[in-house]
């Protein structure tokens, strides 16, 4: 059990038999009336996001989530195989659990896998990864009135929007949370 004072991003709550992760929270102290906590919760199984408000000081049930360091090894059909960094046990995760994060997975990449009662819940990647552009159209100077972007395919097969000056073979830093271009990596 945890109080609303213990809320933090990433905390997993158990509500009506389902696991919900706190994505955002805000303590609100209105001038009139009792304080409360406004939260944005994400269902760890379905990914559904809901807003929920708690009165300050309310106790809620938390779930024990074990985050383990692992390394991505390879893809086997529709499963992604990861090796636990502590006991070297291999964990195949289904494509449905990995989701769009598959666009940024590289072999030997360090990740974290969250488990609840021995069952994998979700995968966490580093905030940014370095990927090589395998294909993009050349950007022409002077063909636009303002700064623009173009699609580029990176080594994992994902397509991201990049500035016009990016060429095939460039290494990019990409945000794994939303797939956005962060910058070019100097070789």
Curated annotation (Swiss-Prot):
The gene is efp. One of its GO terms (molecular function) is translation elongation factor activity. SUPFAM superfamilies: Nucleic acid-binding proteins, Translation proteins SH3-like domain. Involved in peptide bond synthesis. Stimulates efficient translation and peptide-bond synthesis on native or reconstituted 70S ribosomes in vitro. Probably functions indirectly by altering the affinity of the ribosome for aminoacyl-tRNA, thus increasing their reactivity as acceptors for peptidyl transferase. This is Elongation factor P. Belongs to the elongation factor P family. It is found in: Cytoplasm. Pathway: Protein biosynthesis; polypeptide chain elongation. GO terms for cellular component: cytoplasm. HAMAP family: EF_P. It comes from the Bacteria. PANTHER family: ELONGATION FACTOR P (PTHR30053), ELONGATION FACTOR P (EF-P) FAMILY PROTEIN (PTHR30053:SF12). The lineage of its organism: Bacteria, Bacillati, Actinomycetota, Actinomycetes, Mycobacteriales. Disulfide bonds: none annotated. It comes from Mycolicibacterium smegmatis (strain ATCC 700084 / mc(2)155). NCBIfam families: efp, PRK00529.1. Keywords: Cytoplasm, Elongation factor, Protein biosynthesis.
């Amino acid at each position: 059990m945890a109080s609303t004072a213990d809320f933090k991003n990433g905390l997993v709550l158990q509500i009506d038999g389902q696991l919900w992760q706190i994505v955002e929270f805000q303590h609100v102290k209105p001038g009139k009336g009792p304080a409360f906590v406004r939260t944005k919760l994400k269902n760890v199984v379905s990914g559904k996001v809901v807003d929920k408000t708690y009165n300050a000081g309310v106790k809620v049930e938390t779930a024990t989530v074990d985050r383990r360091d692992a390394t991505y090894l390879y893809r086997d059909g529709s499963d992604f195989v990861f090796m636990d960094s502590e006991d070297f046990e291999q964990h195949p995760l289904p494509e449905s659990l990995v989701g769009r994060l598959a666009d940024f997975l590289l072999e030997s990449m360090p990740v974290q896998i969250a488990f609840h009662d021995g069952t994998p819940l979700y995968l966490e990647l580093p905030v940014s990864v370095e990927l090589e552009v395998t294909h993009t159209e050349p950007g022409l100077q002077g063909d636009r009135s303002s700064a623009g972007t173009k699609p580029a395919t990176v080594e994992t097969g994902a397509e991201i929007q990049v500035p016009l000056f990016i060429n095939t073979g460039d290494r990019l830093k990409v945000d794994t949370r939303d797939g956005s271009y962060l910058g070019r990596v100097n070789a």
